[in-house]
Amino acid sequence: MRKLPVCVLMIPLLLAGCGGAGSKAEETALEIRSACMSASACTGSAEITADYGQRVYRYQMDFQAGQKETVLTLTGPDTVAGVVARLTNEGESLLEYDGAVLETGPLNEDGLTPVSAIPAVLNAARQGYLETCTLEEREGREELRMLIRDPEQPLGQGLESSLWFDTQTQSLLRAELCQDGFCVIQCQFSQFTMEQEETQVK
């Protein structure tokens, strides 16, 4: 008998708030979430904008997110290009390279920073509670928008993540992380790929 991984069995629960049963948006979200959960690694490039209210930071980086750690290589701006961070599941906000230190500080009480944004986005895609999922048209392309949030918080409160995926390629296109209704992180992704593990069915 084939045994399904627990993570696969949990998918319907994590889609509980997503549209009507059997809708195209729900089916697409199920397929994309399943791919995210079964991926052994995600790679790509991202442009991160972090809004601290009085300060706005912009970074460009390449990333490789595995099951145990995420490796980020900053490519811009020039003052921090070449900085490399290795983040565990707990995440870090301190980067060191040749004695230089970059510390931007947390954006919320949970310690969200520009450095931890990519792990936070991928974690939301894999296992966050899906409040809604809708299909949108943008520049002639069909996209799936996922709104992921804490179901115990009122709408617009706490951390809410909006993720957009290309429905054809399942590539992550962009993301917005909002804290109490204020957008603190924006991510624009390119060359996003998910590497799938090869499994044998007995």
Regions from the PLM with identified roles:
Residues 95-153:
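Flexible, processing/modification-adjacent segments and terminal tails
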Residues 49-51, 77-79, 100, 180-182:
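Hydrophobic lipid-interacting interfaces of membrane-associated proteins
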Residues 64-119:
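An acidic-aromatic
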Residues 131-202:
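Gly/Pro-enriched, hydrophobic low-complexity segments
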Residues 17-64, 68, 198-202:
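N-terminal leader/targeting segments and the immediate start of mature chains
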Residues 54-56, 78-80, 127-129, 156-158:
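Short solvent-exposed loop/turn micro-motifs enriched in small/polar/acidic residues
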Residues 40-48, 55-74, 83, 93, ...:
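One face of beta-strands
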Residues 1-16:
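Sec-dependent bacterial lipoprotein signal peptides
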